[in-house]
Each structure stands twice: as C-alpha cells, then as structure tokens.
Amino acid sequence: MRYLMITIMMLLAWGVSAPKVNAEVSRADIERGKSLTFGRKKGNCLACHVIADGTLPGNSGPPLVAMKARFPDREKLKEQIYDARKRNVNTIMPPFGAHEILTAEELERVVDYIYSL
C-alpha cells in the first residue's frame, strides 16, 4: 500500500494528465472530410457503408453511426481507416493510409468527418 501511495504521489508531482483530445476540428475540416468520404475518387466510403445523408450506400461494412461511442479513442478510428488489416487480417476494407489511397492530410479530414457522426 505504501508503494502505491508513493507511486500516485510521484505521478501527480510529475503532472501526468489525460491525453489531449483533438477538440479544435473546424467545420471546414469536417466538410472536406465529408467530401472525401462521399467522393468516388478517394474515400468512396458509401460504396460499403451506410452514412447519414448518403445516397445509394453499400452494405458490406457496418453503418457509420455513433462513431464516438464505437471508437472513444479517435486514434483507434484513424488506425482502422489507415489499415484495417491490423485488427482483422481478413477484412475487405482497403488500407487507405498504408496503400496511400489517402494522403496523411486527407486521412485526418476523413477521420474528422467520420468521428463527427
């Protein structure tokens, strides 16, 4: 018990805090992400997922709803889009980041939009 208290006191003294959340996402970033998500040239997420406001969605992937509940950690969502094979080697989802289908900036915008759903 003594060591636990010492450890807690040391962590508090060093200023350990929770990870920062990307709360500074602009409306323009979300709109750019939506454009990429719905566009057929880059993201084309509608080909496989049901998304609010989307027309003619596919159904081979899960619907993109309640994303903050499904991915409380935004980085986990980003990792999933970057390369879904890391969590499921048999996935049919393309590795958008690993295969450079999306640039790093485009990936951030897509994550901004999807995380807003």
Please report, for each region that a protein language model flagged, where it lies by residue.
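Positively charged n-region of N-terminal signal peptides that target proteins for export
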Residues: M1-L4
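Bacterial N-terminal signal peptides
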Residues: I6-W14
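Electrostatic cytochrome c docking/interface patches
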Residues: P19-R40
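Extracytoplasmic/secreted proteins, especially bacterial periplasmic and envelope-associated proteins
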Residues: R32-L36, P72, K76, E105-R109
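Gly/Gly-Pro-rich "capping" loops immediately C-terminal to redox-active cysteine motifs
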Residues: F38, L46-Y82
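Cys/His-enriched microdomains
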Residues: G43
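Axial heme c-ligation environment in periplasmic c-type cytochrome domains
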Residues: G58-M67, Y82-R109
